[in-house]
UniProtKB/Swiss-Prot annotation:
Residues 149-163 have a biased composition (Low complexity). CDD domains: DD_DYDC-like. GO terms for cellular component: Set1C/COMPASS complex. This is DPY30 domain-containing protein 2. It comes from Bos taurus. It holds the Pfam family Dpy-30. Gene3D superfamilies: cAMP-dependent protein kinase regulatory subunit, dimerization-anchoring domain (1.20.890.10). The gene is DYDC2. Signal peptide: none annotated.
Length: 194
């Protein structure tokens, strides 16, 4: 059992240690051998730790390169879309000036910020769609919240009601989310589960 442990921990280095003990011929060979093996084990662990850290640093470096490339691609895509929008607005302006109508100028919005807003609103509405509102009422009070559409807690929302949730404009979806937050502030005991 001891030989298996030594072979597993030190491998061929044990033979090297015994050869060194034979060459040096210290006064206490067992103590010398123990010191040599302890030192070898300590340096082997340090080398393994350094190797693992280098691997981790290499992974982090590769991930940061990927993120940098993705950010650059998104910037290029945003620039291309912005240029397309400017080109379309320019052509629309030329067409309108040829016809004689002058519409109000439309401000150009950053595509990235509008995409982020849309993604944020979609994530918020998905959370509302996945978890139906569960409201607790105090004894003697009504379960109705003024100005909020009510659902029966025992019935599943129908497919048509789910479709209605998805067909609203971002402003309507945002308005519904704000209404829900206001309702929770008005009735603090009726919080939905996280």
């Amino acid at each position: 059992m001891e030989t298996n442990y030594l072979k597993r921990c030190f491998g061929n280095r044990l033979a090297q240690a015994l050869a060194e003990v034979a060459m040096v011929q210290p006064s206490d060979p067992i103590e010398y051998l123990a010191h040599w093996l302890y030192h070898y084990r300590k340096t082997a662990k340090a080398k393994e730790k350094d190797r693992q850290e280098k691997i981790q640093l290499q992974r982090e470096y590769e991930n940061s390169l990927k993120e940098t490339r993705m950010a650059e691609m998104l910037k290029q895509e945003e620039r291309a879309i912005q240029e397309q929008c400017e080109k379309c607005h320019y052509q629309l302006g030329r067409r309108n000036s040829a016809v004689g109508t002058h519409p109000h100028p439309v401000p150009l919005i950053s595509v990235a910020s509008s995409l982020e807003k849309t993604k944020f609103m979609q994530e918020n509405t998905e959370a509302f769609e996945k978890e139906p509102l569960k409201q607790e009422s105090l004894p003697g009070t009504s379960d109705m919240i003024p100005g909020m559409p009510q659902q029966s807690p025992s019935s599943e929302p129908s497919v048509s009601s789910q479709v209605d949730l998805n067909t609203g404009t971002p402003q309507e979806i945002n308005y519904q989310a704000i209404q829900h937050e206001i309702a929770l502030e008005i009735h603090p005991g009726s919080e939905s589960p996280p």
